[in-house]
Design a protein with these regions (language model features):
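N-terminal juxtadomain amphipathic helix
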Residues: 2, 14-92
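Long, intrinsically disordered low-complexity tandem-repeat segments
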Residues: 9-10
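Conserved SAM-binding loop
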Residues: 26, 104-225, 235-252
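Acceptor-substrate binding/catalytic loop of class I
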Residues: 46-52, 226-240
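Short, solvent-exposed loop/helix junctions and linker helices
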Residues: 52-60, 97, 187, 237
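Conserved SAM-binding loop and adjacent beta-strand
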Residues: 88-103
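A short, structure-level motif marking secondary-structure boundaries and short turns
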Residues: 88-90, 114, 227-229
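The substrate-binding groove and active-site-proximal loops of carbohydrate-active enzymes
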Residues: 91-92, 184, 230-234
Length: 252
């Protein structure tokens, strides 16, 4: 870790600084007067349930230094993901499954060797991770929801828990490939999170460390003025440039 990254972490202790680079040069771009319910609540069953659900402040800021967008009002550990069923999404949709198959095939054909150790953070129902079972028998998934359908996937070593940096204490084999889909936007300290992956990953034969990340595109949100995409569930709103800044700062 370089000196600048250490300074960044110290600066981020100030809640008014950027959560990636630590800069205090930030500006609010979206701060509605009304508080928002969590988007994961979906539709409530009754009118009274809708009125009584918890609501949260949303103050989206942009960092002038690294260009990252984030919710300044987000409180760490304010959302629990361990008490809900995972809706990994469209398991019975042919189009969605075809899309997942194409994505997995691209990863297998271009990045993986036989018997690589694959780790997925926030693996949901395990459908995507299971698509690599024809390439390796070492598939490890972390998913905090105890109601995940992943328990039915015998090909996967499942941990019904949040992923923590002490992963190496529980596994003899270091991962060769890490997958994280629609997780990073929920993480309150993304730089430390990505640095953890860099330190635990094995290098491939090209001396590369491989990390696959999917996040919602804030570029599309900004291009279409779609401010409904700003809600409390997401700490971060990544653009291509801010995500690149993050993973480069972490050592990749």
């Amino acid at each position: 870790m370089n000196k600048n990254n250490k300074n960044n972490k110290n600066n981020k202790n100030n809640k008014n600084n950027c959560i990636i680079c630590g800069s205090g040069d930030i500006a609010k771009i979206f701060s509605p007067s009304l508080k928002y319910p969590l988007a994961r609540y979906g539709l409530t069953k009754t009118h009274s349930d809708a009125l009584s659900c918890s609501k949260y402040e949303v103050d989206v800021c942009v960092c002038d230094k690294c260009g990252h967008f984030f919710n300044l009002s987000y409180k760490e550990n304010s959302i629990s993901y361990s008490d809900e069923a995972v809706q990994e999404g469209r398991p019975f949709s042919r189009n969605y499954n075809d899309y997942q198959e194409v994505k997995a095939k691209n990863i297998k054909d271009n990045f993986l060797k036989n018997n690589d150790v694959i780790l997925e953070i926030g693996c949901g129902d395990g459908m995507f991770l299971d698509k690599f079972s024809d390439k390796t028998n070492v598939l490890i998934g972390y998913e905090p929801s105890t109601e995940s359908n992943l328990v039915n996937k015998s090909s996967i070593e499942l941990h019904h828990d949040y992923f923590t940096p002490d992963y190496s204490l529980h596994h003899e084999m270091r991962p060769s490939f890490i997958i994280m889909r629609h997780v990073l936007e929920h993480v309150s300290n993304p730089l430390v999170f990505i640095e953890t992956f860099y330190s635990m990953l094995n290098e491939n034969n090209l001396n590369e460390k491989l990390l696959y990340i999917e996040v919602p595109s804030n570029n599309k949100t900004l291009d279409s003025n779609r401010f409904s995409d700003f809600y409390y569930d997401h700490v971060s709103y990544f653009t291509i440039s801010s995500l690149s800044y993050l993973i480069t700062s972490a050592g990749f």
